[in-house]
Amino acid sequence: MTNHKENEMSKSELLVVTGLSGAGKSVVIQCLEDIGYFCVDNLPPILLPKFVELMEQGNPSLQKVAIAIDLRGKELFKSLVEEIDAIKSRNDVIVDVMFLEAETEKLISRYKESRRAHPLNENGQMSLMDSILEEKQLLSNIRTIANYIVDTTQLTTKELKARVKEKFEDENFKSFSINVSSFGFKHGIQKDADLVFDVRFLPNPYYVEDLRPMTGEDEPVYHYVMKWKETEIFFEKLMDLLKFMIPGYKKEGKSQLVIAIGCTGGQHRSVALAKRIGEELTEIFDYNVYVHHRDAHIESGVRK
């Protein structure tokens, strides 16, 4: 007899990629194609049910499909939420939605750099700012049903691709993953974080001349940060909290948890703590744990 788990594994998987224009949908689709997804760009929402019917016929090439949908569909886009809900109710295809967004200022910068017109401003009658704000309003409904919301404001193309690969490169969607990220408050808070912890109360290696050019990834800085009693107490209390909270997030159906650790510049204290937290979570949980240091190298002009 085929059990429930085997039935789930045999189902085709559909990932709908949508979000704000300029937030990175093209990058995501290209990356998904590289890791084995059958990708379709700008499919009119009205054709989505027909496409799903093809997936249900068992074609091996349509086992994992990613479809990018945006407001170029104009009036047709209004039906997208209803179309997705209808597909989910049929229970024949696993459907997930990824929504990409970025801060307005960043979107404006990207559009000016690319010199392309916004999809809502093809006739030139709207300002770029008004086009972006209207798009945010029009997409608000689809954002509410998204499984994955990714803020690309601070992400390079390389980092965005890494996020996509971390989540979708395996044969099946990963049921739950934890992303631990360090950042610097002076460079802006991490927008897509679920939990943010401020470690600026800990002794700062920045004021030790030999340690200043290093990061928390370097052993001397790591040991300096971790040697203090207050660091150890904080770490123990934080791990107790995370061990309590994380199973609850998973139980509620959350597929990804982003934990952000912030210090002043994102170079020393937050990096060391994020590193240790990631190692500890890997030991405790049978989940995929990823560690990312957003601002560790920004002082040298390189964001890795």
From Swiss-Prot:
A Pfam family: PapZ_C
Family statement drawn from the similarity comment of this UniProt entry: Belongs to the RapZ-like family.
Nucleotide-binding is among the record's keywords: yes
Stated name of the protein: Nucleotide-binding protein SH2124
Organism (species): Staphylococcus haemolyticus (strain JCSC1435)
Alphabetized NCBIfam families for the sequence: PRK05416.1 (NF003828)
Record keywords, A-Z: ATP-binding, GTP-binding, Nucleotide-binding
Annotated positions binding GTP: 70-73
InterPro entries: P-loop_NTPase, RapZ-like, RapZ-like_N, RapZ_C
Molecular function in Gene Ontology: ATP binding; GTP binding
Function: Displays ATPase and GTPase activities.
Binding site for ATP: 19-26
